[in-house]
């Protein structure tokens, strides 16, 4: 757990000094409640800096946080992210109390597909394996052979023996995987409301304005964006790329808070962006996190059959990605 001094130092890269001073008492209260409840707070990379740096014990992308959820010894998991992420934590630790600070923190991708959609596709393409991006509900995962994240999508697809794969629900991630594999990809018209907003023109304008800028995009973006980027990867892969790179000017094509959080880790870099905000991620606030711990709200409950089947699809992914 970071000290309040360490938190304050990290937050001063994003907030005014008086804003930091206002946040610290609430952060201190959350830290106290965490210890009382033996709770672990998992924070996705798209959390605002006060949540990301201030109260999250473990931060990262969906793949890493899924593994942490499966391995934790904490009694309570509070997921600072959106609803499908908390559901995934419940799948992987069904015996734990899993909380999310706001039940309305949804996801445009998760809302784009239903369990029945998957059943219908399986009937239309019998015997074809189904790969589902983790950005979906638990009952969709329950109809899936194996899950994937943006960090391991190609690895998962290539691991399957079939020449044809059903890949759901992100059409842009599917298209970017299709460009890297010989397998035939059958997909679904889902998309991320944040990443689909970026265009090739955004990159061209930024390159003209900042000659020599390094462009890093998320694979949920359109192919025209990914193809024009210097690198494309998951949020954790973006961080790793920057850590190993000497690039000074970086155009980060993803959700706003990712850049805000990286500024604290890389104060010597200049992040330029046409920022896109995820309204769902921004529903998670310090006040709601405090109330979640204080009142044990809002707990994730899943049908036992969904847990059994959905857990298998996530576990297959983890076994593949973290095999020893």
Curated annotation (Swiss-Prot):
Its main location: cytoplasm. One of its GO terms (biological process) is 'de novo' NAD biosynthetic process from L-aspartate. It comes from Leptospira interrogans serogroup Icterohaemorrhagiae serovar Lai (strain 56601). It is found in: Cytoplasm. Disulfide bonds: none annotated. This is Quinolinate synthase. Its cofactor is [4Fe-4S] cluster. Belongs to the quinolinate synthase family. Type 2 subfamily. It is an enzyme of class 2 (transferase). [4Fe-4S] cluster binds at residues 107, 192, 278. Keywords: 4Fe-4S, Cytoplasm, Iron, Iron-sulfur, Metal-binding, Pyridine nucleotide biosynthesis, Transferase. Iminosuccinate binds at residues 44, 62, 133-135, 150, 218-220, 235. Pathway: Cofactor biosynthesis; NAD(+) biosynthesis; quinolinate from iminoaspartate: step 1/1. GO terms for molecular function: 4 iron, 4 sulfur cluster binding; metal ion binding; quinolinate synthetase A activity. It catalyses: iminosuccinate + dihydroxyacetone phosphate = quinolinate + phosphate + 2 H2O + H(+). Catalyzes the condensation of iminoaspartate with dihydroxyacetone phosphate to form quinolinate. GO terms for cellular component: cytosol. The gene is nadA. Its EC number is 2.5.1.72. It holds the Pfam family NadA. Binds 1 [4Fe-4S] cluster per subunit.
